[in-house]
Amino acid sequence: MEKSGFSPVGLRVLVVDDDPTWLKILEKMLKKCSYEVTTCGLAREALRLLRERKDGYDIVISDVNMPDMDGFKLLEHVGLELDLPVIMMSVDGETSRVMKGVQHGACDYLLKPIRMKELKIIWQHVLRKKLQEVRDIEGCGYEGGADWITRYDEAHFLGGGEDVSFGKKRKDFDFEKKLLQDESDPSSSSSKKARVVWSFELHHKFVNAVNQIGCDHKAGPKKILDLMNVPWLTRENVASHLQKYRLYLSRLEKGKELKCYSGGVKNADSSPKDVEVNSGYQSPGRSSYVFSGGNSLIQKATEIDPKPLASASLSDLNTDVIMPPKTKKTRIGFDPPISSSAFDSLLPWNDVPEVLESKPVLYENSFLQQQPLPSQSSYVANSAPSLMEEEMKPPYETPAGGSSVNADEFLMPQDKIPTVTLQDLDPSAMKLQEFNTEAILRSLNWELPESHHSVSLDTDLDLTWLQGERFLANTGLQFQDYSSSPSLLSELPAHLNWYGNERLPDPDEYSFMVDQGLFIS
């Protein structure tokens, strides 16, 4: 800035540091800023140079930690003898050291590593020092002139010596320049306004006035000032305080919204499934397992609990099962679903045993093909699994000391199938009306006399297929005594020696009642 007689270019800087590496780095950086640099490794040597050339340096940059003299001691000597601006620097930025440097008269405190941007503006300290001297001599009362000169010279220096346009800030420069020109006129000197301190009583009056008017756009500074009735308070003071008060209220509203939102998220985390799990755990029920039979294998077991905790056998249709807290219901189904049948189950699902097929033994002297006894039967292994002979063990274990739970909770209400047992069968409902009795008997390798008519069999016998069993039951001719008939068969077929899925111990110990007209032509 040539008009004021000061230019940042060629600023004379004395750098004091005991580290030669940092001396070289700072020397290169300062020279890039077009400064004249002098380096020194000892504080006493730097003090000697300053005394010899009192007007030879504009600013001093010194390290705090020096081997021969403390950096703060050097700062005191320079401030008392030469009155030059001194910048202190160090590796650590402890608050105590920074405050000590400011108290001893340091104009700035830099931390290593020092940036180029910080070195480019050290000339401002020199300019402020000179302006302060001018104000002290001429009695200049305007304090904004130094700031304006600082900003203008900084823009001039960083812009390469060219004028830099600041847009709207240019008006501020013109205004401050005009004030500098009128500094010699006492009447034109501006006085700084006193800052208003909002005490508790004053703020209480302000809040009451706002509440009377309403905290909205209608609450203007003029109305509030009239209601407060404070003589020395201005409209600008009320407007500034009103703006801060509205910002405070908006922050409170945002805080409430965040609390409400966080509370809503926490309540939404509890899903209906959790409620269902809790209620299912507290109120156990009782039911039985039901299995659907058919030719197709299990298609899919959906959503099985990965941690099986209870086990139960299917031998008892109404078995009590101890169930842990469950998260999802288990459903086992077949495609296509056929009739339901209940059977005993002891083997696990993954172990499907080989099916044993019994071959009947043919007797030449009997017109009926007799089924062999278990000791006489020959079995053939079949690799195809049979659902009627598979025995299952669901992956649940019964914990000790648990509560009884109804197993019907495994099935959805619409998927529950009534259980059918031998005692619940209705003979009239299980009749095979569409089959010829003769064809059925021939398929079982039964030999019939040639003179026998199949019509009589259909009319006399009321044959019923018991589901889940392997024989026909004559349900029509019941409660009739034929024990005195001499025409009873001498040999009773072995397959008729089964009753209720259990084989009789000895066929000779029991007398069977057979219709005399069963095999008479």
UniProtKB/Swiss-Prot annotation:
A GO molecular-function descriptor: DNA binding
Placement of sequence motif Nuclear localization signal: 192-195
SUPFAM superfamilies: CheY-like, Homeodomain-like
Record keywords: Activator, Cytokinin signaling pathway, DNA-binding, Nucleus, Phosphoprotein, Transcription, Transcription regulation, Two-component regulatory system
Compartments (UniProt record): Nucleus
An individual GO BP term: regulation of salicylic acid mediated signaling pathway
Database matches in CDD domains: REC_typeB_ARR-like
UniProt tissue specificity: Detected in the whole plant. Predominantly expressed in roots and stems.
Domain of life according to the entry: Eukaryota
Record PTM: Two-component system major event consists of a His-to-Asp phosphorelay between a sensor histidine kinase (HK) and a response regulator (RR). In plants, the His-to-Asp phosphorelay involves an additional intermediate named Histidine-containing phosphotransfer protein (HPt). This multistep phosphorelay consists of a His-Asp-His-Asp sequential transfer of a phosphate group between first a His and an Asp of the HK protein, followed by the transfer to a conserved His of the HPt protein and finally the transfer to an Asp in the receiver domain of the RR protein.
Main location: nucleus
Transmembrane stretches, start-end: none
GO CC, alphabetical: nucleus
Modified residues (4-aspartylphosphate): 63
InterPro entries for the chain: ARR-like (IPR045279), CheY-like_superfamily (IPR011006), Homeodomain-like_sf (IPR009057), Myb_dom_plants (IPR006447), Response_reg_B-typ_pln (IPR017053), SANT/Myb (IPR001005), Sig_transdc_resp-reg_receiver (IPR001789)
Gene3D superfamilies in UniProt: 3.40.50.2300, Homeodomain-like
Function description: Transcriptional activator that binds specifically to the DNA sequence 5'-[AG]GATT-3'. Functions as a response regulator involved in His-to-Asp phosphorelay signal transduction system. Phosphorylation of the Asp residue in the receiver domain activates the ability of the protein to promote the transcription of target genes. Could directly activate some type-A response regulators in response to cytokinins.
Entry's family note: Belongs to the ARR family. Type-B subfamily.
Oligomeric form and interacting partners: Binds the target DNA as a monomer.
Protein name: Two-component response regulator ARR11
Species of provenance: Arabidopsis thaliana
